[in-house]
């Protein structure tokens, strides 16, 4: 793999750094090509400039989490990724009865902008070291479980106390910068009125689909425009916004980006890397593949999709293959060099409450599961690619060699490494139990009904504790977020798919891993919920008169497979067929719960309606709750023990590296990374240039059309609208499409603005190529590359293809 320009300039040390480190890094950034002072970038300090670039950055998505966005106008216009906005587009489509996801959307007037559901923007206003408060409150505890809970509670209490003193509905969070050593408080301004402005059609915003995902060359229009509004219904006026550079950036140019990358584990011991490679990642991949298969089957059934056409039946090449033109009117072409005419005084409509979703007939499944399906497909390819790269670069062997060197220099490291190996051995031994429980509690896009029941039952148990000792998601300050998340999942239930997920959870779970006893949990009693009061005894809910249980029938039932008979009159064999699972789904009262009802039940479980208490899915959760609680406590203790050991190990390493700057692992907070627009060589005799064009997109579509005619169904994802193809062929082939650069990114950097040396917007980050998937564990500038949508593609699509002259003018306004 060829050396990168940034590797030559700085070795391999320049990674992704907390925004607060900008001043310390400024000398090196300037040497690379940065032309801005540090104060013009970092606006999070106590005396920071409100116009600093960091104040143009937002964390955007459901409840403020999902990806990165940035203000690109003084009127609250936000650019983010198509896939970050996808869930908002999907929800808006269901409410309006118009498929914005397939057809795209453009608001030519602000009155046409569409309200999103649950989407918020969070702006990082301040960050502050609160290590003393957290470590002092928790650091003396020796018991692993109590210690882990003490650190959790101290961080959450610090955030809660500080939030109470903030004005205007601000949100505070405390994150571990160096676990058990350094903690940082982040203060966010929350904007809860976010509206759709522009979304390209799916055939462009997701061009290439899963085939092109994490690959180069790439030609995807993965961007969208939103607008934030204030409480007064007027467009939000940010203290800073990015200027757009209409000429983009060229090969070799210095670039940097800001964003909210998720989590890295770059200081992980070899034992953790082995566990990821052999246990955790393979398990996730199996789970994701299974769920994707179930989703595909549900889609085929819902849409009556025919098998791919045989070659003999192929229709004319491009005409049949090109996606149908979006139903919106053909827009007027716009010359990007001409300033839009002055508009009349705009109106600022108040945010209207979301309208109820119209009944969907055909295609309803696709809109309901689009975001979940894309997320699972993305995570499956990312996880499998990450595992492949772990092996390809030999990271486990490399880390073992580093650990041997550390032990030679600091013998005290040996017992720490041995104890860490024991932690991961235990995590491996209990992995089957966790897998079963995750299925039964609906995580990772599993059953929404099981997920809702799990949260409600957990709330009933946790309600006996003081608020400051409950699970974080069940504390008062978080209940709005929890209720919104659950309500969204329940609203998206597509009954046939939900039944398949329920069946998979109930028949695919490893009961032996949950219960060491010869027979499985008493799920027959759980399902016979209409005739029992055991649950009220457990959670302190009021009892009601019940019929006696036929103990003889119960004992006979325990001998049947899965012990899931007696389910609302089912025949022996229980919930072992899709029809039986569908019966459970159709009868469940949880499906009808909305956000307000869920919020009330989570806050006061003892007032939960009897029909919810007695729901069959509540019974399932009750049956697996004891092992769930035991697993949660043991896993938390193991992770807490790991954090203590890793902190001590890093103390030894940093003591040996005195004077060398160290960057902490990513934790979802605002960060900066820098690099160059540059290609790379992935393997022998292959060199990748750093830019693609619209002409390359057309060529790829033409090639895919031939493959589609030959029966390749996946080629459907390479079908742009016919009018788009005509426009590109008419003179736009050389317009840049996507761009490659050597910044350090990972999940959470979706939507990060790529900025030139002067801090101007030149691209929007949306992906990495396959070798860069190992970034979670290691960044290497020789082969780690990120992919962005070139600003010239954005301007061409918004202006020329969709004729939104006012939006282009707004983006180019200084």
Role assignments for model-derived ranges:
Residues 1-814:
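Terminal presequence/propeptide segments associated with secretion/organelle targeting
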């Amino acid at each position: 793999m060829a050396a990168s320009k940034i590797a030559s300039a700085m070795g391999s040390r320049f990674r992704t750094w907390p925004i607060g480190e900008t001043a310390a890094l400024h000398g090196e950034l300037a040497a690379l090509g940065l032309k801005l002072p540090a104060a013009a970038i970092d606006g999070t300090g106590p005396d920071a400039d409100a116009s600093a670039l960091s104040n143009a950055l937002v964390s955007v998505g459901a409840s403020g989490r999902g990806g990165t966005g940035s203000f690109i106008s003084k009127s609250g216009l936000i650019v983010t990724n198509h896939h970050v906005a996808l869930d908002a587009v999907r929800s808006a489509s269901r409410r309006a009865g118009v498929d914005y996801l397939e057809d795209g959307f453009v608001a030519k007037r602000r009155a046409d902008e569409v309200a999103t559901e649950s989407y918020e923007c969070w702006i990082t206003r301040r960050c502050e070291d609160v290590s003393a408060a957290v470590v002092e409150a928790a650091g003396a505890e020796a018991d692993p479980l109590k210690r882990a809970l003490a650190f959790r509670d101290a961080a959450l209490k610090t955030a809660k106390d500080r939030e109470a003193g903030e004005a205007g509905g601000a949100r505070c969070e405390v994150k571990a910068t160096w676990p058990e050593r350094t903690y940082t408080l982040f203060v966010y301004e929350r904007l809860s009125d976010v509206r759709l402005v522009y979304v390209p059609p799916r055939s462009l915003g997701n061009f290439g689909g899963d085939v092109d995902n994490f690959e180069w060359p790439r030609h995807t229009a993965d961007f969208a425009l939103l607008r934030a509004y204030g409480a007064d219904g007027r467009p939000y006026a940010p203290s800073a916004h990015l200027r757009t550079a209409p000429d983009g950036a060229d090969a070799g140019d210095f670039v940097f980006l800001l964003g909210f990358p998720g989590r890295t584990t770059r200081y992980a011991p070899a034992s953790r890397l082995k566990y990821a490679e052999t246990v955790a990642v393979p398990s996730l991949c199996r789970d994701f593949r299974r769920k994707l298969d179930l989703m595909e089957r549900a889609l085929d059934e819902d849409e009556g999709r025919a098998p791919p056409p045989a070659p003999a039946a192929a229709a004319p090449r491009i005409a049949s293959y090109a996606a149908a033109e979006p139903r919106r009117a053909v827009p007027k072409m716009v010359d990007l060099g001409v300033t839009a005419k002055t508009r009349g005084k705009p109106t600022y409509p108040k945010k209207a409450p979301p309208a109820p979703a119209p009944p969907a007939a055909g295609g309803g499944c696709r809109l309901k599961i689009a975001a979940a399906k894309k997320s699972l497909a993305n995570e499956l390819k990312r996880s499998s690619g990450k595992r492949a790269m772990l092996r390809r670069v030999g990271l486990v062997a490399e880390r073992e060699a580093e650990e041997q060197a550390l032990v030679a220099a600091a013998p005290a490291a040996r017992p720490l490494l041995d104890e860490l190996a024991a932690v991961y051995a235990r995590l491996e031994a209990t992995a089957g139990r966790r897998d079963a429980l995750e299925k039964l509690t609906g995580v990772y896009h599993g059953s929404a009904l099981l997920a809702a029941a799990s949260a409600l039952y957990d709330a009933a148990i946790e309600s006996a504790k003081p608020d400051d000792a409950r699970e974080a998601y069940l504390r008062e300050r978080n209940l709005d977020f929890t209720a919104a998340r659950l309500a969204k999942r329940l609203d998206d239930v597509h009954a046939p798919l939900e039944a398949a997920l329920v069946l998979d959870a109930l028949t695919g779970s490893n009961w032996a891993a949950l219960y060491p006893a010869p027979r499985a949990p008493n799920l027959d009693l759980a399902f016979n919920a209409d005739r029992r009061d055991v649950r009220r005894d457990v959670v302190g809910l009021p009892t009601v008169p019940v019929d006696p249980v036929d103990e003889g029938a119960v004992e006979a039932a325990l001998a049947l497979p899965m012990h899931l008979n007696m389910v609302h009159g089912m025949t022996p064999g229980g919930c072992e067929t899709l029809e039986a699972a569908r019966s459970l789904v159709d009868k469940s009262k949880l499906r009808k719960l909305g956000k307000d009802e869920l919020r009330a039940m989570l806050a006061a479980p003892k007032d939960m309606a009897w029909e919810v208490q007695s729901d069959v899915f509540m019974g399932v959760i009750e049956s697996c709750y004891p092992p769930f609680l035991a697993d949660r406590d043991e896993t938390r203790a193991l992770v807490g023990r790991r954090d203590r050991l890793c902190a001590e190990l890093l103390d030894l390493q940093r003591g040996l590296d005195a004077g060398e700057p160290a960057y902490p692992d990513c934790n979802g907070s605002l960060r900066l990374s820098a690099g160059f627009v540059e290609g790379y060589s992935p393997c022998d005799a292959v060199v990748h240039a750093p830019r693609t064009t619209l002409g390359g997109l057309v060529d790829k579509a033409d090639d895919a059309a031939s493959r589609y005619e030959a029966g390749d169904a996946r080629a459907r994802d390479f079908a742009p609208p016919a009018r788009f193809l005509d426009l590109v062929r008419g003179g736009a082939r050389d317009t840049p499409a996507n761009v490659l650069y050597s910044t350090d990114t990972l999940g959470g950097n979706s939507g990060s603005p790529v900025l030139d040396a002067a801090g101007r917007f030149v691209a929007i980050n949306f992906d990495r190529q396959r070798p860069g998937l190992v970034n979670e564990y290691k960044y290497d500038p020789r082969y780690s590359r990120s992919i962005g949508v070139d600003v010239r593609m954005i301007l061409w699509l918004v202006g020329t293809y969709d004729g939104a002259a006012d939006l282009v003018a707004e983006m180019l306004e200084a």
